[in-house]
Amino acid sequence: MDSIELKQLVPENDSEPGTPRQLLFQHYDISNEETIGIKPFKSIPAKVYILRVTEILTLGLLHLILTWLPEFRLKWIEAPCSNEDVEFVAISDPSGTSSIEKVSSICLKNDIQTSSFVLPSGKTRYFEYKKLRFYLEPLNLQWVLMPLETSAYSLVTSTPAYIQNGLDTFTIAKLRQVYGSNSLVSTKKSIVTILLNEVLHPFYLFQAVSVLIWLCDSFVFYSCCIVFISSYSIFLSVKESKESENRIHSIIGAPQPVTVIRNQVKQTVLADDLVIGDLLYFSNLDLKTCPVDGILFSSSCLLDESMVTGESVPARKFPLEDNSLDSWMIASCNIFSPHLIHAGTKFLKIDSTPSTPCLISVVRTGFRSNKGQLIRNLLYPNLRPSQLYLDSMSFLKTMAILSFVSIVFIAIYLNLYNASFGHVVLRSLDVLTILVPPALPATLSVGIANSIARLSRALIYTTSPESIHNAGCLSTFVFDKTGTLTENSVQLSCVYVKSGSNGLLKQVDADSLSLDSTKLNAHAYRVATCSQSLELVGNELVGDPLEVTLFTQFNGTFCATIRASNTPHPPLFSVSNSFDGPSQIFSIYKALEFDPVLRRMSVICSTSTERSLMLFTKGAPESILAISSQQSIPSNVQEVIHTLSSKGFRIIAFASKNLITPLQELIHLSRSTLESNVTFQGLFVLESPLRESSKDVISSLLRSKMEVSICSGDSLFTSVFVAKHCGALDSCNFIYTAELADSGDDCPQIHFEKIDLQTQNFQPIPDGFSLKDVILEKDSSLCMDGKLLQRLLTMLSFNEIKILLSKLRVLARMSPFDKATYVELCQKYGCKVGFCGDGANDCIALKQADVGVSLSDSEACAAASFVSKKKSIKDVFNVLLEGRCSLILSHRCFQYMVLCAIVQFSGVFFLYLKNYNFNDNQFLFMDLLIIFPLSAAMSYFDPAQNLTSNRPNSTLFGKGRVKDLGIQSVLIWLSHGLLTLILHELNWVELPEWQLEKSNTKNVLVTSIFLLSSLQYLGICIGINQSSEFLSPIWKKKTYVCLCTTIGLCNIYLCFANENHIISRCLQITRLPTLYRFIILFMGVISCCLTSILNM
């Protein structure tokens, strides 16, 4: 549910004219994952007029800047106010992103009554934010989203004969005005709009200004090349944006016709015309996608919910029979509700008859539906800038400050020599374009782009490119167990049933079930075949893999169900088994779906001969034992469960109960009443084999000093067994298992067991042993269930929880929300966390993690950072390697671009002192034939083959990097200064005199600094790109080696080439003394050596 928190802010100067007495800041929770802050503002007319005049005088430049920085527009022309006078609202989210939305008005023809407030007829103010409309509630002056679920409930309960009549035309028109339609249409941007958005980006505008400066300085050819490269880059960006937009619209799809009951008749309308409270009519002829979130009112149906929940197993939905508000809210707000049908889910089967059609009441439409939320996430992704990007922007600001200091110095210096004003401006701006490389942030994404390409070729797709850098600095990785570390397939190992003589459990192997059914009692067959989730779609059996295994192992058969029109509660489906024979048919009347909290599922059925009702239930042993009568529980059950769990088996307990209450009354009884005082019957023992690659991946992560944890919904000892056999516990000698003992005290009683991993034996626990003893003991790890973890979080101190997290290796009985909570907890304590799951119950944790690797490709798993099409756990290894590779390449590209800018700035600085400059072809040679190819080749290094214990630094300013950059910058300046000094002191040649209006571009000093700079560009590249444990060996990258060799030979050739050679004439290289040429070459080699030493 949405929630609101209001904060009253008192202005500092309450007597200031025009200042309201109270300022209202509103904190609003749109959902559990989306929170915004809303602050109202109003315009100051005089300041608005001044700003518009200024925007005109600056030819729109100021308007463009304020478009990039909307918060500055607010500060200049808007004043904070109360919601009574609001004209604009400033929206902020926890990531720091802000936006300004205009407040509009709508004229309501009638009052709109909701459960918590009333929107009166007349003028009502609202604003739209990311496809959601917020209304100003007039009584408390609060911004609110319309409460769809409660409003839909009011419509259903207040409409006379709702099931027969549906909504009337008047109500539909009133609802559409306020709640909006069911449209998910997002206006497609034209190519021109996308192009303008790209061109008006600060990066390309800076490029455009730079090109104008270069053209004024007669660098025509160089400018044309930059324009061509930038145009191609813009083309690629526009193409990518358009393709992304088309992908989103393909998910939305075209509006489909649906049947709806309105004004007492069935009508066919487009799905876009639906409103909350509408009554949809579906039949088996309408096996299509549901366009809204709705509550099922009659009949039952089988759905493919993979798009919304990520669950690959089809889900059966049942009608909501309890019409209370509490039941309605639980059904409509719980994503796993058995009565809720999500928008975007596909009907596989509808069990409807003319007397009981499939009727669905609409509770959420448009972007408020679950599919709408998915589309909103795609349209407005939560783009948190990486630390690397933020660091590069900070460094750009530093470079900008340095450039302005240099501009002032150059301007003063040139004025001393009576240079013209135009020449001073041109040289000053030229310094700015050299020292502040606008492509610096873009170079950080080159390594990411190459990593994405390599991952795509390996069938690993990313939905969050910025997460690749996060993958390079993970410290903790969490794995789901079932379907991730183990195979999806489940095999029945054996069955334990009660012995007739003494009531103890006895074992029956799975191989003998089909040979001699008398070894088992009838309940094992009946529970196994009377399944809750199985369906026969066509000729294919679909459902939970565990139930499919039990059904087929016990020779279950689906039977045709005869639905009598006069039967008030027809069966959902019917089955038979080999024990009772084909003549004994079991009809399932009610299915209590698997509940992750209760950890069990049940069915109510009857036989075709006795017609007596029975309840069969199965689930986690502790869950079934908790509802079983004490006299039915064998005395050796705990011993058997403990032994089997320690061997890694998955245990499902089952029980039964004879029901004497009539069916029409049973249907309305609560689950807790039905599932009570059952008779315990036995245990199904199953096993899921480990994936072949699980142990290799886990071992590699542990060798790289990464913390590895396993989260599972299975029992504690089963999870520990899997963790041990996949190598997750190899780094410790002992493990402690901790379980919460039943106790009514506020302080929980914890039962510990100590296991020696070398001998596989249980060790004695001393008296008075506590959790703090485990925390303090070295070489040990801790395993516990989710229930105990939640209790401990409320009891332990900050430091104790931190140590606890470092020792936790296995977490059992974890619900989907428990997994996400554990990931969030690790992040809270400073860990970068990765999570790998199969998508079924892991969507929340996958989204919460810094890096989520999904082994499912359903649409719901778009929340994961990476999706494996091969569904292989080895892809975790590939993602981590690519993350480290892209991170180190981004560091190197950043360092290279910065040092190249300093080399070029240092060179032109010493040339400007004589009013000299590089010529057009020299700039072109340095930038496009040396810097650009080398920076591109640098970014194409492949990742290393193995993970190492070291991790690359996530920040650009760590481990003395700034100090190294500073030292290298000083060395560059000293080398250029020394070269200039040598030329002056030796007096080998006479330099041209100062020219007032034009810089000299052909003389010995220009040639010398050009040759030295060219050598330094190559030397810096070689010095930076040394062997790294995160990258493949340099010699394997033949393109890079060949390019460096070619550029090096070209530079040596230029040092000694005759000035009359065609290349020398093209680059305007003048004649140099031979010794001086050797000095230049020597200084270039020394620069390379010093750079290499500093980067070791």
UniProtKB/Swiss-Prot annotation:
Gene3D superfamilies: Calcium-transporting ATPase, cytoplasmic domain N, Calcium-transporting ATPase, cytoplasmic transduction domain A, Calcium-transporting ATPase, transmembrane domain, HAD superfamily/HAD-like. PROSITE patterns: ATPASE_E1_E2. It catalyses: ATP + H2O = ADP + phosphate + H(+). InterPro entries: ATPase_P-typ_cation-transptr_N (IPR004014), ATPase_P-typ_cyto_dom_N (IPR023299), ATPase_P-typ_P_site (IPR018303), ATPase_P-typ_TM_dom_sf (IPR023298), ATPase_P-typ_transduc_dom_A_sf (IPR008250), HAD-like_sf (IPR036412), HAD_sf (IPR023214), P-type_TPase_V (IPR006544). GO terms for biological process: calcium ion transmembrane transport; intracellular calcium ion homeostasis; transmembrane transport. SUPFAM superfamilies: Calcium ATPase, transduction domain A (SSF81653), Calcium ATPase, transmembrane domain M (SSF81665), HAD-like (SSF56784), Metal cation-transporting ATPase, ATP-binding domain N (SSF81660). Its main location: endoplasmic reticulum. Residues 42-47, 217-220, 413-425, 916-922, 983-1003, 1061-1075 are lumenal. It is found in: Endoplasmic reticulum membrane; Golgi apparatus membrane. The active site is at 480 (4-aspartylphosphate intermediate). It is a multi-pass membrane protein. Keywords: ATP-binding, Calcium, Endoplasmic reticulum, Golgi apparatus, Magnesium, Manganese, Membrane, Metal-binding, Nucleotide-binding, Phosphoprotein, Translocase, Transmembrane, Transmembrane helix. Residues 1-19, 71-193, 239-391, 448-895, 941-958, 1027-1040 are cytoplasmic. Its EC number is 7.2.2.-. The keyword Ribosomal protein does not apply. It holds the Pfam family Cation_ATPase_N. Belongs to the cation transport ATPase (P-type) (TC 3.A.3) family. Type V subfamily. Plays a role in regulating calcium and manganese homeostasis responsible for cell cycle progression. This is Cation-transporting ATPase 5.
